[in-house]
Regions:
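Short, surface-exposed loop or secondary-structure junction motifs
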Residues: 2-3, 110-357
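Short, conserved catalytic-motif segment at the N-terminal edge
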Residues: 4, 11-74, 94-96, 110-122, ...
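Short, conserved phosphate/pyrophosphate- and ester-handling motifs at nucleotide-, phospho-/glycolipid
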Residues: 16, 79, 281
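Active-site SXXK
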Residues: 24-27, 47, 73-101, 198-206, ...
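Short, well-ordered beta-strand elements
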Residues: 50, 373-374, 380-389
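Short clusters of small/polar residues that mark proteolytic maturation junctions
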Residues: 54-56, 260, 387
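Acidic helix-start/capping segments at beta-turn-to-alpha-helix junctions
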Residues: 102-109
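Short glycine-rich, acidic/polar surface loops and turns
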Residues: 344, 360, 365-375
Length: 411
């Protein structure tokens, strides 16, 4: 999608223009002192872009600037798109949210749960209830990520080759069978843990729809919404627009270029990762957030019903508790106190517990390379921040962005 531009004066939609400039002034320092390579920020209200700015470089070594059409690896900002895809199928009657995952992935019929022992000799018991589609959408399945480095099951994932993604050459179907053979961290539905659940959900989408995940995204979501640059890899003709990927290694303070991981975006992946595989642009993701703000509809194209979007963006954790209370808020991308979890989104339930400017009912997520977005229905506000620095916990970009956006609202 091209033609991204500011299309309303900020003061016409309740912003103080001078206060909005504080966003740019603050994040310029991140580039000037070398913490970030470059960034793009987009702030929209009532469907109109009120603030759009770029700064720094998409490729530091080649001195190429961040531009409005720069392509970014959005990593876990893929998850909301996968969740929307699943709920589109749910609306069509393809499954119930309570259906066992084993209906679509038979290897999930006999999962076992870790109860003790070591990562080398785990003690397990059968799952009391099946892993259900609802558990995948809410990250309450008991699955995990190998890169958490917290629980013995995390180490079991790493030993099996699942630290980041899956072993080379493995496709999504095989990865799901591999994950099903490993112990769950807890009984399904009993805790929250950020995990490969959304990748498994991607496989459910494939089986339920009879389409590969990339085809489903392209035909059912991206094409209808005009998201022309969003895909699982960047075509050769567009690769000069792709930002380089940087990382701050553990125990260090300086960012380094990470081409080994970054260059995977330039070729079609064997594993279509609904949990983190997409590359996109600010314009495309803006279209996606506007569809959400429009309760499932954008420019006459409806992907979801209004009640479905409302349900997805409501805290689904039992008793209305937050992520901090219900489970293991490791790598929750955007915080855990005062924040519940819906069907694919973190949801602000208690702004006082968040201890920062925000709105009740705002929903959001982020990605491994420090990207972030949120949708605030109460303020008709959407915000997108794109950069390419791993891990996302390196700097407090997301809370700082929140406070700088909300302090500029004056109506």
């Amino acid at each position: 999608m091209t033609g991204l531009k500011v299309d309303v004066d900020a003061d016409e939609v309740g912003f103080d223009p001078q206060r909005l400039q504080r966003i740019d002034a603050h994040f310029r320092t991140y580039v000037d002192d070398g913490r970030l390579p470059g960034w793009l920020v987009l702030v929209s209200r009532a469907g109109k872009i009120a603030h759009l700015s770029t700064y720094g470089q998409r490729d530091v070594e080649s001195a190429l600037p961040v531009e409005e059409d720069t392509l970014f690896r959005i990593y876990s900002m893929t998850k909301p798109i996968t969740s929307v895809a699943a709920m589109m199928l749910y609306e069509e009657g393809a499954f119930q949210l309570t259906d066992p995952v084993s209906r679509f992935i038979p290897s999930f019929a006999d999962v076992r749960v870790y109860t003790g022992g070591s990562s080398g000799k785990p003690v397990t018991v059968p799952a009391v209830e099946p892993v259900r589609i609802w558990h995948l959408l809410t990250h309450t399945s008991g699955l995990t990520y190998g890169f958490h480095y917290v629980h013995p099951v995390d180490a079991i994932y790493r030993a099996a080759g699942y630290e980041f993604g899956a072993p080379p050459g493995m496709d999504l179907a095989a990865a799901c069978d591999g994950w099903a053979a490993l112990p769950l961290q807890f009984q399904p539905g009993s805790e929250w843990n950020y995990s490969v659940s959304t990748d498994v959900l991607g496989r459910v989408i494939e089986v339920a729809s009879g389409m590969s995940l990339d085809r489903f995204f392209a035909e059912r979501i991206c094409s209808p919404l005009g998201m022309t640059d969003t895909a699982f890899h960047v075509p050769e003709a567009e690769q000069d627009r792709l930002g380089a990927l940087y990382a701050v290694p553990a125990g260090q303070h300086e960012k380094v270029r990470h081409d080994a991981m970054g260059r995977t975006a330039t070729r079609p992946p064997r594993l279509l990762a609904g949990g983190g595989g997409l590359i996109s642009t600010a314009a495309d993701y803006h279209r996606f957030t506007q569809m959400l703000l429009g309760c499932g509809e954008l420019d006459g194209t409806r992907l979801l019903g209004t009640h479905t979007v409302a349900y997805m963006t409501r805290n689904q954790l039992p008793g209305g508790v937050d992520i901090e209370t219900y489970g293991r808020p490791i790598n929750a991308e955007t915080g855990s106190k005062g924040i519940g979890f819906g069907l694919g989104f973190g949801v602000v339930d208690d702004p006082a517990e968040v201890k920062g400017l925000c709105s009740r009912g705002e929903y959001h997520w982020g990605g491994l390379a420090s990207t972030a977005f949120w949708v605030d229905p109460a303020e008709e506000l959407t915000v997108i921040f794109l950069t390419q620095l791993m891990p996302s916990s390196t700097y407090p970009i997301r809370p700082e962005l929140r406070q700088l956006v909300y302090q500029a609202l004056v109506d």
